[in-house]
Amino acid sequence: MIKFENVSKIYPNGTKGLTDVNLQINQGEFVAIIGTSGAGKSTLIRCVNGLNDITSGSLIVNDTEVSKLKGKELRKFRRHVGMIFQSYNLVPRVTVLKNVMFARVPDMSLFKVIFGLFSKEDKLVALDSLNKVGILDKAYIRADQLSGGQQQRVSLARALSQESEILLADEPVSALDPVTAKEVMDDFKRINEEFNKTILLNIHHVELALEYASRIIAVKKGKIVYDGPSQEVTKEILDEVYRKEA
């Protein structure tokens, strides 16, 4: 479970990223965050795994107060929260399989990390994750030989190999063509339904958010202006979310 209680985030330059956010996201939900650029979507997601510190309030993830975590404790916590970025963050000249196994590095000794000594279990988990996103046949191909959609699937497989219950995604399909974007969203939906993973993603494509997510959270100027079922999002709500104020 993810629980925001009166969470605010103010950046060092005085910009308000979030203001008095109150949310509860239960295990197994598929939630899409929508809003204009700079509305606070990425800030909200990045607070969940501690990439952004909160300024005030309380943020609890699976009974852990995230804002109190530092150093080793924060790194340990992040192992259980998968993160998928828009830019894939893959090592280009390394195989797909090894890119996925890199998610297991935090549990390895320094010696094993230096020499790339992954265990049989690490390999099996990585192969299973690749199978779940439909690219097992690409396991021994270099990452830079894949299409954008395939690379994003590798990122998703890497997050799955952490064996986390929560998957965060920061604009995961914004760089993809419409057909490939739907294929990647299909993967998210299937993983959500088959494995009861909590999916929390921010997305510019409103039509995809409404089609795939069961719940929509709309952010405007760091505040939650809508939180409810996707089927109840009206044109009037979207007009309010995306209307530019003079």
Swiss-Prot record:
The keyword Repeat does not apply. ATP binds at residues 35-42. Belongs to the ABC transporter superfamily. Phosphonates importer (TC 3.A.1.9.1) family. The keyword Glycoprotein does not apply. InterPro entries: AAA+_ATPase (IPR003593), ABC_transporter-like_ATP-bd (IPR003439), ABC_transporter-like_CS (IPR017871), ABC_transpr_PhnC (IPR012693), MetN_ABC_transporter-like (IPR050086), P-loop_NTPase (IPR027417). One of its GO terms (molecular function) is ATP binding. Part of the ABC transporter complex PhnCDE involved in phosphonates import. Responsible for energy coupling to the transport system. Coiled coil: none annotated. It catalyses: phosphonate(out) + ATP + H2O = phosphonate(in) + ADP + phosphate + H(+). Pfam families: ABC_tran (PF00005). GO terms for cellular component: plasma membrane. It comes from the Bacteria. It is found in: Cell membrane. The complex is composed of two ATP-binding proteins (PhnC), two transmembrane proteins (PhnE) and a solute-binding protein (PhnD). It comes from Lactococcus lactis subsp. lactis (strain IL1403). Its EC number is 7.3.2.2. PROSITE patterns: ABC_TRANSPORTER_1, ABC_TRANSPORTER_2, PHNC. It is a peripheral membrane protein. Residues 2-246 form the ABC transporter domain. CDD domains: ABC_PhnC_transporter. This is Phosphonates import ATP-binding protein PhnC. Keywords: ATP-binding, Cell membrane, Membrane, Nucleotide-binding, Phosphonate transport, Translocase, Transport.
